[in-house]
Amino acid sequence: MNLGGWPLFDVDEGAFSGATTEMLSNGNFISTFIYGAPRFDKPILIYWLQALSVTAFGHTEWAFRLPSALASSLWVWVVFAFARPRLGNAPASLVAAMLCLSIACWGIAHFASADALLNLFLALAFIDMYRYWEQPSARQLRRVYVWIALGLLTKGPV
């Protein structure tokens, strides 16, 4: 993936990367700001992940987009891992390829925004809910709650 091959260009990419940059410069990892003004449009999780990435790999487009690329890759893998025992290797591979090659999945994997992470947590919640319906257990249900909570920390009810 060529994550750093073009500048941050979308309004969302600018807002997310700007708020993350300000988070790193002012040291406030609880409240987000952009140009000194509060930015409470989105919950905090994606900013933390971008801050980790930028701290580890430098202040580049690639580093801001890395959390989205990793979340999209995990999303495809999770769908494949869920489909494989139910459909077989070849159909599960086809499902993963179709997801991977869809413009939506490809697009959000390349943007510094919260969408890929939210899709990963939604997929995990739905998959664990399905597993709960297959074989009810409190553990499966708790995992559904965890994925939903992480989804709320990603995109939230804000």
Explain the meaning of each model-derived region.
Residues M1-V158:
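Membrane-integral, polyisoprenol-dependent glycosyltransferases
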